[in-house]
């Protein structure tokens, strides 16, 4: 194959011209003198149409019939070089169609397991390496890519430096019961839950830093919102107030949504996502409500006919039904701020004048997607942090480097983290987080 290849997504620039595309056959139909071939190349889906009379006219009867017969016998997922004239077609969702003039088979495909019929979730997950080729799964991956691209763009534009934290560590950032342990030359080591502790060191050196990478939680959870391995963006910054941190988080989430609208509009269309809702989340300010006000609100509405959550007292933590109700009540992404210190991490700074509450926030996404961001101001006073660790019975020797940060020029600082898969699930409008990552790792799944 010597002709220059173009991507399907670029065919709009070649209307009326003959082009060659390297693609896979997603589906095929037609009868008699016409064949329709659904093509995909990773950038988009595209329909090609082959007319038998045109092949006979161009190649002669014997060669023309032979070439047309090859097209008629194509199997799903056969890889091909296909050549044709790009034409505008208002009937097509893509807006264009390919009048096929030639086709060369690259790799045959026989008995492809994921046929156009309905399949069960377990079957599709067992064949995840193939399921990724489907239209909707490709769309989700394109949205994921847009979110990752927009993450780097946003932090670069806001003066942050990429700072890579280690994946192996001898201590936990938060809950030590959720760690995956491994042997590190005869000593115990743990897969990272978060890069936050190391990012705080980065913030003391570079001012504003972020990292992006895989993290691991040994949670024995089978909900639609949990993975044991997922990708996290953590950001840390010095000399920023709590309110300024919330402003930054809001701007970041809006930038991610806008990035998907700009870079993956066809993916949103394939998934039938409510684009107007996404635009509204950008246009309207996010709501901010204190934890205690949220509890009061839940108590006031728990007898309503449309509520489905358990009663909570002040000091109780939210469950998913409570988060869903709160975000749906306000109708836009909602920050719940100043949670009780009793169930938050040791490093969070208390609210001035109220040591039972901490300067933190969870961002709850509407439409039932729940928490997508968690963040806080960090305790920057050495003595206060040591006292908190002693209260919790923590081994301070495991956090000597972390305590050092408070001994040598400590400053007000904070940070937040976002699970990329939760953000992908929210923006894409998918029902389960397992579709937001190429190869999900869950309680009972570690392959393919």
Curated annotation (Swiss-Prot):
Location (main, coarse): cytoplasm
Domain of life from the UniProt record: Bacteria
GO function terms (MF aspect): asparagine-tRNA ligase activity; ATP binding; catalytic activity, acting on a protein; nucleic acid binding; transferase activity
Keyword list, A-Z: Aminoacyl-tRNA synthetase, ATP-binding, Cytoplasm, Ligase, Nucleotide-binding, Protein biosynthesis
One term under GO cellular component: cytoplasm
Reactions mediated catalytically: tRNA(Asn) + L-asparagine + ATP = L-asparaginyl-tRNA(Asn) + AMP + diphosphate + H(+)
A matching Pfam family: tRNA_anti-codon
The EC number(s) this enzyme carries: 6.1.1.22
UniProt enzyme class: ligase
HAMAP family (UniProt xref): Asn_tRNA_synth
Family: Belongs to the class-II aminoacyl-tRNA synthetase family.
Name of this chain's protein: Asparagine--tRNA ligase
Gene field: asnS
